[in-house]
Amino acid sequence: MADPKGSTSKDGLDDWCIVEAECSDIENDLEELFDRDTDSDISELLDDNDDLDQGNSRELFHQQESKESEEHLQKLKRKYLSPQAIAQLSPRLESITLSPQQKSKRRLFAEQDSGLELTLTNEAEDVSSEVEVPALDSQPVAEAQIGTVDIHYTELLRASNNKAILMAKFKEAFGVGFNDLTRQFKSYKTCCNHWVLSVYAVHDDLLESSKKLLQQHCDYVWIRGIAAMSLFLLCFKVGKNRGTVHKLMTSMLNVHEKQILSEPPKLRNVAAALFWYKGAMGSGTFTYGPYPDWMAHQTIVGHQSTEANAFDMSVMVQWAFDNNYLDEADIAYQYAKLAPEDSNAVAWLAHNNQARFVRECASMVRFYKKGQMKEMSMSEWIHTRITEVEGEGHWSTIAKFLRYQQVNFIMFLAALKDMLHSVPKRNCILIYGPPNTGKSAFTMSLIRVLRGRVLSFVNSKSQFWLQPMSECKIALIDDVTDPCWLYMDTYLRNGLDGHYVSLDCKHKAPIQTKFPALLLTSNINVHNEITYRYLHSRIKGFEFPNPFPMKADNTPEFELTDQSWKSFFTRLWNQLELSDQEDEGDNGESQRPFQCSARSANEHL
C-alpha cells in the first residue's frame, strides 16, 4: 500500500519549525472582542448614531470653485503680465516711490499648511512691490501671427483717448509733435487747399496705391510711412473741408475715421517748412509735383519772398487805381487775395497798420480819380467809359423804346446834346409819366454806363446831400416829389441855369463849381404846375405814358444794357457833336497811362 500524500513528520524538524498554530480562547470569543472596543486608540471612529447632519455642501463647493478660479487667474498673470514693466519703461522711475518701502520680516514660526493657500499668499506678497502694467506692444506669439492691422485696431479699442494715442505714436515715429506741424481748424466745414494727415495702421498695398490715386486730386503730394504711422501732406487742386478729405482717405485707404488726424499745415513757420523740405529729400519719402509756394518761400534761397521787402504805399495805390477800387472794403479784401503773387501785399499783411494804409489808399485813389475826371472833357469821359464796356449791342433798342413811349427821337437827341455840352438852361432833362413806365430803368442805365451819381432827397436835411455833384459828370435825382420840386424852386435855380454855385462839402470849405448834367424822374409834369413856373424854362421834359413791356418769361422787351448805350454813343457820336479823340490828342502830349507809383532810379522808361 502506497504512502499517503502530504508532508510527513521527520525526525529533527519539529524542534525549530512550528508546524501547527496554537489556538487561543480569547481570539475565538468574538463577543469579548467587541466588548473591548472602547479601550481602543481609534475610538469613536464609527458613529453609531442613527441621526445624521447634512452639513453645508454648497458652501464647500463654492470655496473649491473660488480656489480653482484663483489658481487660473494667477497662472494668467504669470503668463501675460511682465513683472518688469516699470523697469522697462524707465530705470529711474522704478526707484521713485511715494511711500517708504519696508523689507519683509522673517517669520518666527513656520506656518503649517497643506501647501496651496500658503503658496498663493507668498506669491502675492512677492509681486506686490511691482506694478503690473500691460504693454501695448506686447502680444502673445500666437496672436502676433494674426497680423499687425488687427493689433493696431486692438490698441485703439483699448485706449480711452484715441487722439492722444495717435499723437503719441506719431511723435514716437517721426520725432516731432503733430501740432508742431499744423494749425488747428475746429470746424469740419472750413475749406483749405493744403492738408496734413496722419493715418494709423494702413495696409502697405493700399499705401502704395494711394501714391498714384492722389495725383489726380493734388498738385503736390508728400507721403512717408514709419512703422504703423503714415504721414501725408496734400495740396489739393481745389479747396476741401475736413469731412471731404476724410471721406476721400477712408475710401482710398480702407481705414476708419478714428485712425486719421487731419489739420492744415503751418504756412508761416520756417521750422515746419524745413521739416517738409528735408523730409522730401529722404529715400523713404514719396513726392509728386513742385514745391508749394509757402514752402518754397521759406526754404529756397533767392526766392522772391525771402527778400525782406518793405511795404510801398505807392504800389498799393497804383494797383487800386488801375483796377478802379474806391471802396475801403474792396481794397482790403482784393489786395489780401493778391498776397501769394505780390511781395508788397505780403509786406502789407505783415504790417501792424493795415487799416490805416487801406483808408489812406482809398482816399488817394479818390483824389486821383476826381482829378482825372475834371481834366477830361465830356467827350473824352464818354469815350473812356464806353471803351471799358465789353461786348457788343445795338443802338436801335434805345430808339425803339423811345418810339414806344411816343418820344420824338430827334427832339430827344437834341436835348441830350445840349445837356452833355452844359448849355445854360438846357442842362436838365425830366422824364415824367405814370408809375411802371420804365423811367427809372431808362435813366439808371445811362447813369451806370457813364459812371454817374444818384442823389436821394431823403438826405436833404443834411447840408452835404448835394456833395456828390462835385464828383461826377452826370447825376440823377430819382422820383422827384412836391417837397423836392419846392426845394429846387427855392434853392437850385442857379444850378439848373448852369452857373457857378457855392457847394458845401464835408470836412472842407464850400467850393465853387457847376452842376453836372442832371437827369430827373417824376410822376409830376412840372410844366403843368403853375407853382413851379420859374422851373419851366430850366427843365426839358419828356413823357413816358405807356407801361414798360415785358415778355412771357418776365424779362424786359427792351434790354437797356451798357452794350446798347455803347452802340448808341458810337453810332450817334457825330450827331451829338462830340469831339474826335484824335483831335484832342494832337497837342503832342504822350498818351501813357497814369503813373502814381514811385519809380526806381535804374528803371527803364
UniProtKB/Swiss-Prot annotation:
Plastid as UniProt keyword: no
Keywords, in A-Z order: ATP-binding, DNA replication, DNA-binding, Early protein, Helicase, Host nucleus, Hydrolase, Isomerase, Isopeptide bond, Nucleotide-binding, Phosphoprotein, Ubl conjugation
First-tier enzyme category under EC: isomerase
Record PTM Phosphoserine, positions in chain: 82, 90
Residue spans of biased composition, Polar residues class: 588-605
GO annotation (BP), single: DNA replication
Region Disordered, annotated ranges: 580-605
InterPro entries found in the cross-reference section: Helicase_SF3_DNA-vir, P-loop_NTPase, PPV_DNA_helicase_E1_C, PPV_DNA_helicase_E1_N, PPV_E1_DBD, PPV_E1_DBD_sf, Rep_E1_papillomaV, Znf_lg_T-Ag_D1_dom_sf
Motif residue range(s): Nuclear export signal: 89-98
Role noted for this protein: ATP-dependent DNA 3'-5' helicase required for initiation of viral DNA replication. It forms a complex with the viral E2 protein. The E1-E2 complex binds to the replication origin which contains binding sites for both proteins. During the initial step, a dimer of E1 interacts with a dimer of protein E2 leading to a complex that binds the viral origin of replication with high specificity. Then, a second dimer of E1 displaces the E2 dimer in an ATP-dependent manner to form the E1 tetramer.
Family, per entry: Belongs to the papillomaviridae E1 protein family.
Name by which UniProt lists this protein: Replication protein E1
Gene expressing this chain: E1
